[in-house]
Amino acid sequence: MRAESPGDVQQTIRVARDRGMRLSVLGGGHDWAGRAVCDGGLVIDMSGMRSVTVDSGARVATVGGGVIAADLIDAVAPYGLVAATGNCGGVGITGLTLGGGYGPLNGRFGLASDNLLGAEVVLADGRIVKADATHEPELFWALRGGGGNFGVVTSMRVQLHPLDRLIGGMILFPWSQGATVWRGLDEVLSTAPDEWTVLSGLMSGPDGNPAVFLAPAWSGDLLSGQAAVDALTKLGTPLSGQVAPMTYREWLSLFDAWDVRGQCWAINTRTIAGYTPEVIDALLEIGRTLTPPRSGISIHHCHGASTLVAPDQTAFANRRPHFVVEIIAGWEGGDSVRHRAWADAASAALAPHALPGGYANLLVPGDHEQIANAYGENAIRLVAAKKHYDPDGVFTAIPLPGVSEGKRSNAVHRR
């Protein structure tokens, strides 16, 4: 069903329930596990709901349920504003926000979910409600990190922030220097200000061999930022390094190659406290067995403003400084076995050094151990909200601890 209005979504939910059909929701189309589609069921396609309305004075944008990061950033850029998004322009804003939302501006402006001001939601019983600090406050709390478990978000109001340009780019180092680079990066990030976020990881380099990448994003004073960025290039001998003032949209385009749509992917995830010697050793072994050319690892840094929110203020509970390791296996056609095996082995190598739980938007379906610990002490409250707003389990693609995944439904917004 190609939805063009909340009424279309409402009607589709009612049809699915009346006929006992599985239901899924396609938002931005960036979910690696394909949870936005379901064979033999109904798919609510939100891709036609991509409107963005900007109130530049209030610094607020109202976005449709199918809006992707590129849509939002393009709409707000003429006003010298940005929004907290993921690391790729193709990521859906709604699904990203509902699961938490890591990105290059988290240190300064918080997670995407921290910037959610309100939402219009079609509930499992077909009612259309508004959720914000004064209307359905418990639903509003659950939407900020609890995933697509409570209804279909047809529009959201998100906070915007002034930012014309940042300093960013991509620096590649040879794999032989991986240990030195990550040790140095750990020291740099230990005193990093909120304006300073560095995405790191591994990918296939220009020669086809594994390489370490650093993707800095400095959103503060450009003059001060240049010195910080220059220090990164001295952590090793770069294979390449193009770092300069750029727009936020240009920074997001650095990761267009990892847009999951139309490709074959498997993703695992682990959460770590930092680049300890044990973690670095595990990363080096993971890189040694990397399956090129699309596979890699992306390590997201949660710090600054993202850690200043009380754990119980929103459903997203992990508020201590940490890193999310996104293990990405990519391939073409039927060549899946060795790539999936690499991702599984990478996850296993990091497991002894990982924190409990994981990032809901990236968790492997059926990984009950990480799911059980993903929400911390917020899990009990989330399950109660689930029973109140969706007692029959219509929306269950990102399961909550102790909640059955259900037989009829498999709905969640894609990232």
Predicted segments with their positions:
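Soluble FAD-dependent oxygen oxidases
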Residues: M1-R415
